From Swiss-Prot:
A GO biological-process term: ubiquitin-dependent protein catabolic process
GO MF terms, alphabetically ordered: zinc ion binding
Protein name in the entry: MYND-type zinc finger protein C31F10.10c
Entry's localization field: Nucleus; Cytoplasm; Cytoplasm, Cytoskeleton, Microtubule organizing center, Spindle pole body
Residues annotated as binding Zn(2+): 498, 501, 519, 523
Zinc finger boundaries on the chain: MYND-type: 482-523
Disulfide bonding pattern of the chain: none
Record-stated family: Belongs to the MUB1/samB family.
Stretches of the chain forming a coiled coil according to its record: none
């Protein structure tokens, strides 16, 4: 039995660690984070320089111990994240620099499910962030198309006021259909509700005579009326000159506890039909916006709070904030929101040149998957805890490198790559984990897009080229390059090659047409002139080699010796 590697201070016993000249298997079983971090940092150096250490790790159980560290997850502390990162680098060094037998052991130990989880989480996070970034850019760009009106105005509004209100509502109508199926809590936390972080957004309309109130009555102008359902019924009271909800004042508990309250300021002077209208949107706190109407001496303050989609990037004029369900049961009208989101998608076409569009990401996704709208909405729930589980760029690069080396010529290991599971403990969101079978080549093909770094594109293309290699153990046959087709050649040169790269083969025109959107990103063009020049250079080299073998002494003689010998012979004859 191996002795447990623990540090006992009162017995003057130190834990066993690994250094640059000594490897001890017990150091990987240490429960101290600091000593384990120190041992793994030295093990990274040993696995990159010593072939003997790489072989020993696959025999004494050290490789399985590293895999268990990777499956356990990163954790939330700096020490656990560093230990996870060092363990991944050790496994990558063993798989890249090891022999064929060592690479097979690494694949059998379970490195492919870990890489599958990293790649899919990275793509999922990138799609979510890009979709929110595109909405944020759209909210900053001026829009000329007015939002769809769901109900007619109860009184004539001047064009200046209507344009100003439309500009405010357009900033708030950029909600996509990804968020209409549920409430999204705020990712900024409850600390933003303090008094020091209060923001005030106001829109003042000071033209006299712009608003006319018929019959000396006021009305309740709800913000973004098309998002309110039929449950918010209102009633007119001409004697008091106010409009309010029926169920807001009947139950005192609703008025005291519900965040949706109406405060009425009475005045003895009546309101005039033509007066100065000041519309102020005051956001006192991030969770309690207020809408204030002041008509002459009489004023009425209405605090409205309705459900709205919460963005990861806050818009400058966001007067709609998220709230919890109150006793009023304010419900969203799904049809209006979907039609409004459809119009917003049509207007959200101008993005920054350096940011990839959402359509480009969705085109690169695997064919059989549909974008999970609920998953994208849940990605920003508790984002501060998920940021530690977000795959880094070096993690993606390490994963692609080890896949490129382990999928090279090992065709008997293809089932590990084409039918792999994920690791639920490594997932950022529990909604992404499941019993689905993943094809690693379908995930890797998405990293051949142009906006990825050149190193990521290089290794992704190398993996896709390995997928199209010929199987020399079965007579040099190739597989159809369509990722959804599993046909192999019955004999060599049965399938037709791609005309551009002359590497991939397809069993039919349908497979080539179906696989071309993905294959076009990693298809390298081979020019005929280049191939002819290579052939000519090979012929010239073969001719020179034959001449050198025929007369080896002639190549040793300098260039000017023939003229010298001929001149001496002529002198002797004279």
């Amino acid at each position: 039995m191996r002795e447990s590697n623990v540090s006992i201070v009162w017995n003057n016993k130190a834990s066993v660690t690994i250094n640059t000249v000594l490897y001890d298997r017990r150091a990987l079983d240490c429960d101290s984070e600091m000593s384990l971090m120190n041992s793994l940092s030295h093990l990274v150096y040993l696995t990159s320089t010593s072939p003997k250490i790489r072989e020993i790790l696959t025999m004494d159980g050290g490789l399985m111990r590293l895999m268990n560290i990777l499956r356990a997850g990163r954790g939330q502390t700096f020490a656990r994240m560093t230990i996870w990162q060092l363990a991944l680098q050790c496994v990558v060094n063993v798989g890249i620099r090891g022999s064929e037998a060592i690479r097979i052991r690494v694949v059998e130990a379970g490195i492919v499910p870990i890489v599958v989880t990293l790649l899919d989480d990275f793509l999922f996070a990138l799609e979510s962030v890009v979709s929110h970034h595109s909405r944020f850019q759209f909210s900053l760009t001026p829009s000329t198309t007015p939002p769809p009106s769901s109900a007619s105005a109860p009184f004539p509004i001047n064009s200046n006021i209507s344009n100003s209100l439309d500009s405010v509502s357009q900033h708030n109508s950029s909600a996509d259909s990804l968020f209409v199926n549920g409430d999204v809590p705020s990712p900024f936390g409850a600390s933003t509700a303090s008094s020091s972080s209060r923001r005030v957004y106001s829109v003042d309309l000071r033209d006299s005579g712009d608003v006319q109130l018929p019959n000396q009555s006021t009305f309740r102008h709800s913000v973004n009326r098309d998002l309110l359902g039929s449950s918010s019924t209102t009633s007119h009271d001409r004697s008091s000159g106010s409009i309010y909800s029926n169920d807001s004042f009947q139950d005192p508990r609703v008025q005291a506890n519900s965040p949706l309250t109406i405060q009425r300021i009475s005045s003895a002077a009546p309101s005039t039909p033509t007066s100065t209208e000041n519309v102020n949107y005051n956001m006192t706190t991030p969770s309690s916006p207020s809408y204030s109407r002041q008509t002459g001496p009489a004023s009425e303050t209405i605090n409205d709070e309705i459900d709205s989609p919460n963005f990861f990037f806050p818009t400058p004029l966001n007067i709609m904030t998220t709230t919890q369900d109150s006793s009023r049961d304010v419900q969203l009208s799904l049809n209006n929101v979907q039609s409004q989101a459809l119009n917003n998608r049509q207007r959200r076409n101008q993005l920054l040149p350096g940011v990839p569009s959402t359509s480009a990401l969705l085109d690169g996704r695997r064919p059989e998957n549909v974008v999970d709208y609920h998953g994208i909405a849940s990605f920003f729930d508790n984002f501060d805890k998920k940021i530690n589980k977000l795959p880094r760029e070096e993690d993606i690069l390490f994963g692609l490198q080890i896949l490129a080396y382990t999928s090279k010529n090992y065709f008997h290991m293809r089932p590990y790559f084409e039918s792999s599971k994920d690791v639920p403990s490594l997932r950022m969101s529990p909604l992404r984990s499941g019993s689905k079978t993943w094809n690693i080549f379908q995930l890797v093909e998405q990293f051949t897009l142009k906006f990825y770094p050149p190193q990521v594109q290089y290794w992704a293309r190398a993996i896709m080229n390995n997928y199209c290699r010929k199987d020399e153990s079965h007579g040099g046959i190739r597989r159809c390059a369509n990722l959804l087709c599993n046909k192999w050649e019955e004999h060599s040169r049965q399938f037709a090659k791609c005309r551009r790269c002359r590497r991939t083969k397809y069993c039919s025109k349908e497979c080539q047409h179906q696989a071309w959107p993905g294959h076009s990103r990693w298809c390298r063009v081979i020019h005929k002139d280049g191939r002819n020049s290579k052939r000519e250079s090979s012929k010239i080299n073969s001719v020179t080699e034959s001449e050198s073998t025929a007369s080896p002494a002639a190549s040793v003689i300098p260039v000017g010796t023939e003229s010298v010998t001929s001149s001496t012979q002529s002198d002797s004859r004279l």
